[in-house]
């Protein structure tokens, strides 16, 4: 399921020690969570060690965010627009910041804490390279996250939409497509 739908599982690291422990298991992808996104030492080490580095920028002030600009050309870096509030209200999603980040960084995604999938759909429609949502098998379980986490059905909806949005953006040129030739040939100028 996760390979077929291109769903990657990864872990957050909160320290250099965590980073080294995770790297001993896999050096594919690591996430620096919002509260640690100011930690340039951790970011530098992650960029040296991992193939992909995801940084959630929810808790950064403007000055701290600008310090990340020096990494803007790194292909292995994915910046996640995030608002660190649980659960997040639609009016607090602040997608203006998402669009601002897209002007600066090559790879911008979205980490959503809103109930439902509408925020993820918006991010996908605006070409987010990655969507991160919390996942649960049961929304009635204890804990803050389970109340706004996605279930399996929601996750499949997002992966299906991601595929459709990708297909919407395939460049087919400006001329007549093969699929249109029958209509063009048989109906044009008919009336």
Segments from the language model and where they lie:
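Catalytic cores and adjacent flexible loops of soluble metabolic enzymes
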Residues: 1-191
